[in-house]
Every structure is written in structure tokens, then in C-alpha cells.
């Protein structure tokens, strides 16, 4: 038996969680809130960040400098003139944006002792998670290869290895594994037989939305598609067989696994970031590093994004990454992916008025527009209008209670039957 590692707890919200993924389907989550109603939570902390505007602005400048200048000179120059109280709270903002590694490398010696101590603690936690993920990778590889199940490793570890010249500063908190839909049930059975558990076994919910991912207690996110919700998969045209056909090898943790090709990687990073609101600097940095060091062909990015009907998602994040981190995205690429000049102006205005690098407790118009993105501008505006109206008429908790009461009137079905129904829906899809 190959035991899978035990995930560290208290990581803050997880990007694959239903709370976060609800932005794609625009449904009320099992917890009773939509993703656009949740506060931002600092990674490794149960406390929401509460900072005055002055501190947020300083943090934005310093963190952007850490990411724009790998030598750390710009960040250290800012730290020399920054107020001490700003520097003391900087580690919390770095944790929120998941850029503890770059901050630690650039500014650890320039921080006040108490702030340096907090940053060291965060750095050690990230190192521990890194070791857990790499350990899980080797175990997952052995388990799936023994069963003859092809798989891809996406996001965190693969991006760190391929796009970062200094991958040791790009930490990650979980292991994203993609299998073909016909192998999903078998892979899940294997993981469960070796100690894993589904974190949220809400099988009726998973079945209703034909969930494209299950988060396991071992820090593994098991996917059969890049998108969580059937509603968004139906509106777009991503074909996983096509993505698997372009797989390429990557060396990770002393072994070789497969991941997506450069264009598919950039599209996936942008799509994931957009559906999460594009609110973390690390996601924008991943995009920047992928373009700089993993060099996708722009014609492939454009052609696939348009054909898959995800061009608005991709274009929005490319434009945001360019604005925040000077990512080298050609104007013609942005204009092709976002053909409406008025829409580009709207996105630019939102990003300018509500800068992503400035840590905030709650979503802003800039993050809401990204989370609410649909396959075209008209649908996006319509959805955002409905969200605004819903917020004015009823609370998410009240809506959830009514839905829960309606659901309770149905006949009881065992958890095993509900699980089987979900897996059958996954296996029988197009």
C-alpha cells in the first residue's frame, strides 16, 4: 500500500475549493455564500487582513518591486524609506499574495526583527508544504503508473520547474493531477484505498455540477477537466483529449512526469487566475514567468483561446499581468483576445482604481469583473447585473436556506449511491 501524505491544515482558502470555484458557475456554495461574498483570507492565517490605505499602498509598491526586480535592489530601496509599521505588517500581505519566497529572498535582512521573524515562520511553513507536495508527487506517480493511468501535473510544481529560473522561491500548497475522465473513478478509488479522503463529500452537489475536480485530504487535487462546473464547460469548448495529446515531460523532485504544452499552460494559468478574481500577485507572476521562460507561441495561444471560447478570460489576465508586472504581452495579442475597445478600457479602469497589488479584505470591482467573466462581454455584463440585483434583494444565507429546504423535500439517497451517480455522470460525458 502506498500511503499518501497528510496535508498541512490552516492554509487559508484553497483555489480549488467550492467557495473559490463557485465564481465559475455563479451558484451558491454548500457553505451558503457565493465566492464573491467571501473575505480575502491571508494564507496560513485565520485572520483577514485589515490595513489602512497608506500601508496597503506601501505593500503594493514593495511586493511589486520584489517581483519585478529579481536582484531585490528596488525593494530594498523602498524599504529604506518605508515607515516601520508598514514593514512590520508586510509579511501578512506577502502571505496573502503567496509571494513569501520572493519577499524573503529580497527583503528578509531589511525588515525589523519582529517582521523578519514572522517572515521566517511563513517561509518555514511554505518549505514544509513544498516537501509534502514533492513527497506526494512521487507516491502519486507510483500509484497511477502501477495502475496504468496516464496523468498530467499542472500549475504549481510544473510551472515552478519550467517557468522559474529560481524555482525554489516559487512555493506551492497542493498537487494538481489531471487524469482522463474515463480514468477518474479508478484514480479516486486508488487514492481512497491508500488513505486519501474527499475533503467535501457533498455528492449531490458534485453530481449536479458534474464537478471537474475533487480535493483530497492528502493535498492532492484530482481533476478530469480544467474547469470545475458543467455550466462553464458547456459554454466553452476545451477538449481534454486535445490537451493530453500535446503533453510534454518535466523533471520534478528527481522524477519525470508529464504536463501541458507552453500554450496550454499559459491558457490554463490565465483561466484559473481569472475565475479566482485575478487577486493574487503569484498568479500574475506565473503568467509573466511562463511568457518569459516557457515561451508559448502567441499564434497558438490566440487560436486555442478563441476556438475554446476562453479568450476573454485569458486576455483579461494577460492585460492585468502586463499592467502590474510589465509582462511582455504584445498589444495585438490583447486586442485580438479582447476585441472590444470599450471593454478593454473598462478593465483597465477597474485595475487602475482598485489595484490588485494592494491587499484588501474583500473583493473589489476589479476582482468581481474577473470572477464574473463569461464567454462574451454581453453575458458578463448580464451576470454582473444579476449579482448586483441579488445582493440588493436577499442575502446569500437566505438564498441557501431556501434552496436547502427545497432540497430536503426529496427522497433520501445513500452517500454511496450519490457518489456512484456522480462518477457515472463524469464517465458518461461527451
Regions found by a protein language model. Name each.
Residues 2-11:
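Extreme N-terminal basic, low-complexity initiation segments
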Residues 7, 25-26:
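Short helix-onset patch at the extreme N-terminus, typifying the N->h transition
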